[in-house]
Amino acid sequence: AWSIPVKGVRFYEALFEKKTLSKMGWVSTPVTIETTDSLYLAIHEANLTDYAAMNLKPVEQVEDNKTVTLRAALTPWSTGEKVRVTDTRVSPWRTMIVAESAGDLLLSRLMLNLNEPCRITDTSWIQPMRYIGIWWTYHMKHNTWHAGPHHGATTENTMRHIDFAAANNLGGVLVEGWNEDWATWKFSFTKPYTDFDIQRITDYGRSKGVALIGHHETGGNVSNYENQMEDGFKFYEKYGVHQVKTGYVGDLLDGKEYHSSQFGVLHYRKVIEAAARHRICIDNHEPVIPTGLQRTFPNLMTQEGVRGQEWDAWDVDGGNPPSHTVILPFTRGLAGPMDFTPVTFRFVNDVMPQTRVHTTLAKQLALFVVLYSPLQMASDEIENYEANPEPFNFIVSCPTDWSRTVVPEACIGSYVTIARCDKGEGCWYIGSITGDEERTANISLSFLDTDKRYLATIYRDAPEADYETCPAAILIEEREVTYSDTLTIRQARSGGTAVRLCPIKDS
């Protein structure tokens, strides 16, 4: 079974551990299980509303038949109660996906369908997006969130990012560090720093067709945020900001409550509903684990709740290992859209040499497809994209929401290949990634239309590519293919392949 522990882990940001059920401790869900008779199970919950999140504990083992009993363990309030109820209450659904292959787990819509139908009448303002941001530069220590000589969120720097986004068909620019007061973490959500002219920025962005993506870091101070939340959303609505990333960095909410407690669940729901009233989409960081609420409130576009790419910038243990991203689709990915923030083109951090990105460049491109998020960030500093325009062309063209998904091959912890079809042009995009070992991917194209020819643009590891010794080595090639073809491609250690397949129009 693959799971992450509850104790000692903040915001679900941990590496998934592979253990037998009998050796598994108190863990968060989803828990993914491979049985001895080659079935795949995933235990989670759906429609978590005004309740505490479910964790699992093994409580009994019968040695004779190797039976292990798992029991639900709810995240408590600081006072010890699990759930506070004054009237009747409907508990969340307890879910189990049962699949005959690892890939079939990824195609289940069970959790989503157990949530209530959409409550937003007009959803035309809710749109998927590729975006960049003033963010990775902080992790590289090139800029600061707080005001000063190296402040990142300035008018000029934001406009420079808007220019890059406009030139590369990217929909938005996330700006963190725009508001007072990052020096003390007593945040205002309506007062920009003096060097951040939001009127000028949003006017400029509109002229270029690029949105400003807002940011509300709360530091876990829920009371301060709820006192300002309506004004903060009104402020953004006034300037035409329709996407906001929220953050809750801090071990506890209001200094005492767990993020996944009933207190946290109620707060996050309040934020999502308030945002919807102001036509604002939410990217929720440090969340309670997703359970399908995006069906009811589709303005909940994506959430973190994962040990993402940022850990490669500063983790004292060295960063995410190669196997991490070939486990995530079968675990955290089953809970819903995941803001992992991929597409890092520079693999080291000069000020923290003990850590690095443990992938090849081709794998970074493939992650844009493999890890689903309708709001999908290309996280690196734009200078690194400007230095590598040809690989970045894959990101420029790649959608972030899809009409169909297939999984040609998958083995949890070793490799996964996911193909997704766009919602208009009939183009397919493939992301194929591997873990610790070099391998040869055999990607059947049988999902393509049988009566069409396709131009395949393939971004793959060069022969010398290796995530440790030569991560940036990449080859880009084109070939004509049909549904009867199979792509046979070598992948380096922690390598990958990204493919764009577009129908060839007869002249």
Question: What does each of the following model-derived ranges do?
Answer:
Residues 412-454, 497-500:
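Carbohydrate-binding surface patches
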Residues 165, 282, 370, 430, ...:
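Conserved, mostly hydrophobic/aromatic
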Residues 86-168, 172:
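An acidic-aromatic substrate-binding cleft motif
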Residues 7, 458-484:
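Solvent-exposed beta-strand/loop surfaces of large extracellular or lumenal domains
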Residues 362-408:
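Catalytic cores of secreted or luminal carbohydrate-active enzymes
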